[in-house]
Amino acid sequence: MGPNGKPRKYLGVRYDLTQHEIARQNMKGLVEAIDKSYSTIEFDLTGTIQNANGLFLKTMGYSLEELKGKHHSMLIASSCYGTTEYRSFWEKLGRGEYDAGQYQRMAKGGREVWLQASYNPVLDDMGRPFKVILLAMDITGQKQAQVEVEKLIKAATAGQLSERIETESFHGASRELTESVNRLLDAVASPLHEAQTVLAALAKKDLTRSMS
């Protein structure tokens, strides 16, 4: 400042924000991509629900208001709550260790949902976990298709070759799987049925019957 109280010169400090802005935009894009592709839900270290995205809410049939502030245990079968395994699960996350796999969860109304998911502890600047984020994909259709295929194989092994999977309720890859299994069984069963017919005819001495 000059003697008259007016400024004589200005000091300017310029910060290069280019790299910071690039990093911010990259992170923003990553978060948006995850939000569009995965069901996500956030918990504190006690398992209390903090937030959830639209895909998770749609998958589980809840609104955010119905979930926020509630405990993770509302999303699991009642038989699992209070078990040693369930306590160990949250203790593990509290230590900052992630957990991944296929999880059976209960949606609104008791509907069974299967998730391919990972529970990821988030660390603060000191390396201490302070929350857990679940990233998940709904694989309920695949699991149901797997169950139906296993039932069909068991029936075929027992000689029930007329059994087929009702494919109308499946979509996408699950629909393709169940339809292909049905076609495979058709291909196997048809000549077997024909052979059974011929053998039955032979047993009756009807030698005019033959396999085409």
Language-model features, listed with the residues they occupy:
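PAS-family sensory/regulatory domains
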Residues: E66-C80
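PAS and PAS-like sensory modules
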Residues: S39, E85, D99-Q104, M211
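Polar/charged heptad-repeat coiled-coil helices used as signal-transmission/dimerization stalks
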Residues: Q19-K36, K58, E65, R87-E91, ...
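Output-coupling edge of small sensory domains
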Residues: N120-V122
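PAS/LOV sensory domain surfaces, especially short acidic/polar patches at coil-to-helix junctions
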Residues: T46, Q50-K58, K70
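PAS/PAC sensory module
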Residues: M1, L11, D99-Q104, G109-A117, ...
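PAS-family sensory domains
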Residues: K6-D16, R128-D138
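Conserved hydrophobic beta-strand signature of PAS-family and PAS-like sensory domains
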Residues: T40, G47-Q50, S174
